[in-house]
Amino acid sequence: MFSEYSNDPNSQSVYLWGESERLTPGDLLERLQHYHAMSGLETDHFSLGGTVKLLEEQMASLLGKESAIFMPTGTLANHLALRHLCQSQKRVIVPEQSHIYNDTGDGLEKLSGLKLIPLGKNRVCFSLNELKEAIRNAKTGRVDTPFGALVIESPVRRKMGQTVAYSDMQRITDYCRQNSIACHLDGARLFMMSAATKIPIIDYTKLFDTVYISLYKYLNSPSGAILAGPKDLLEPMIQSRRMFGGALWGAYFFAALALKELTSFEETYKKAFMTSELLFSLINNLSGIRITAFKNGSNIFLVRLSPTINPEKFRQALSEYAIYLDPNQRPSRTFTINVMHPYYDKPKNI
């Protein structure tokens, strides 16, 4: 039976899956202590002030936005962004494969009266022509039903981390501006995507009115999110956040852990992708195994084993060197692996 993870907290294990480091409670406490020693933790009051405010200010600057607000979850960040963008026009265009459309129930409709219109069935994103047709149909029906906002999610978890091409983002958001439709980026994994595509974060964010960033995906905070955008749009969200039960009494632990990661994220992931490219090229010189990228991919790669390799024995051999594959993918000759930033500083003598 192959092992799926290491129980040794001191081991230099490599996990080829997931969206953050495998941090134990002890790891988190150690990082908090380090942050407090170096920078000093400052408490907040219902998610206002202190270290939370510092995170908001740094995120606003990194994302090129006027303001930013802490949210306890990405679901709430996306919800409040669309709720406040759609004050009069209540219809929202979303990708059919998006988190907002598939994983939030009917929350936007039930709680904020917004109607989601999915486009781009079973694809990473809809096309500009699909968008034009939807807008045209909304204007020419018996009742004019204009759109208030549009969402782009990138990378897309349901499509193996594939990204929306930057040129497509430009064309879609330009057309929305011409039609007075606000644009929101579900950029939960934006920092990682920027490292993968080598397109600066701010080049992505300048296309959108509002941007959501996850704090637990790749930024190693246990929870939390950031929503960035215009100050006059975000300030009223302080009240909405509280109304929705999202004004945590003390959120500074979450903020501090994300701040600690921000200081090294760009350089760390740059090294991770450079190292993985070299590693994959070396592996592809071996017989019986092939690693390939997805079209417009980010950090998820496809691995194929030849019929001569037993998948279970392959996993077992890796686990003996503390290298672990996704336990949710049962042994198969075709599976995926993720580029995670601990790669480059954990050498393995295999």
Model-derived regions, located:
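PLP-dependent aminotransferase-class I/II
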Residues: S112-P155, T163-R171
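Conserved C-terminal alpha-helix-loop-beta "cap" of PLP-dependent enzymes
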Residues: E4, S88-Q89, N284, G288-I350
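N-terminal amphipathic/basic leader segments beginning at the initiator methionine
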Residues: M1-Y35
